[in-house]
């Protein structure tokens, strides 16, 4: 693993912009100018980690240097890549009594399948502390040591549909936000709230919506209807296949599973998605619905 640590650079204090909420002004020297950065959001349990990990591998199959950052206290974003629960940033910081300058890259960065580099933020014990704070500190640490600059693609796999505080930190650094959803009420309802959060963050940061990834769904009719109504687009569609479940049990990515016609079609879809994202997808200016309007809009089979 050939990643150098440079001296940390301090960020500027928080300042209030004319629009949006209180934001932290990033030092221009800390901006990620050498990589394409994607933040993956979606309802809890929708398959963001599965999607993120296989997308990371797809990018690596295209010859890109990839860093996946798990932003969930469960620290299980990257285990199909690393074949284990990787050490977390918060554990590494605790080991050096939060003297970040004492950390080595190998203390919290693990190389996974096909060279994908993996980082897990970790978090406080269940029911205590603020997971959002931990994610914010992880992003700060990675930027201070310039680790994000050593890659072509950065994939943030973000906790559930929580888009406030530290869990919104990836939006400060992302070029495109991707939303994983299923063709059901709860997933689309959560997607609408995520659209609203990204819309607010886009006032002060460069992040823009990239599109929607349909997952665990035989059909996409409700997703497509919602997309048309608010100004989104579907980038890929992955059905609910048993090979996905088996890959998780084997602690493996889909790219490591035994070939079959249905799996080959899934892998082709991931590679096509990676190619499209690398080539660049047009930013979307989606307008979220009000909750009650969305409630009336969805359903009625």
From Swiss-Prot:
GO terms for biological process: light-independent bacteriochlorophyll biosynthetic process; photosynthesis, dark reaction. The keyword Iron applies. [4Fe-4S] cluster binds at residues 130, 164. It is an enzyme of class 1 (oxidoreductase). Pfam families: Fer4_NifH. Keywords: 4Fe-4S, ATP-binding, Bacteriochlorophyll biosynthesis, Chlorophyll biosynthesis, Iron, Iron-sulfur, Magnesium, Metal-binding, Nucleotide-binding, Oxidoreductase, Photosynthesis. One of its GO terms (molecular function) is oxidoreductase activity, acting on iron-sulfur proteins as donors. Its cofactor is [4Fe-4S] cluster. Pathway: Porphyrin-containing compound metabolism; bacteriochlorophyll biosynthesis (light-independent). Its EC number is 1.3.7.7. ATP binds at residues 45-50, 74, 215-216. The keyword Hydrolase does not apply. It catalyses: chlorophyllide a + oxidized 2[4Fe-4S]-[ferredoxin] + 2 ADP + 2 phosphate = protochlorophyllide a + reduced 2[4Fe-4S]-[ferredoxin] + 2 ATP + 2 H2O. Binds 1 [4Fe-4S] cluster per dimer. Mg(2+) binds at residue 49. InterPro entries: NifH/chlL_CS (IPR030655), NifH/frxC (IPR000392), P-loop_NTPase (IPR027417), Protochlorophyllide_ATP-bd (IPR005971). Signal peptide: none annotated. Homodimer. Protochlorophyllide reductase is composed of three subunits; BchL, BchN and BchB. HAMAP family: ChlL_BchL (MF_00355). This is Light-independent protochlorophyllide reductase iron-sulfur ATP-binding protein. The gene is bchL.
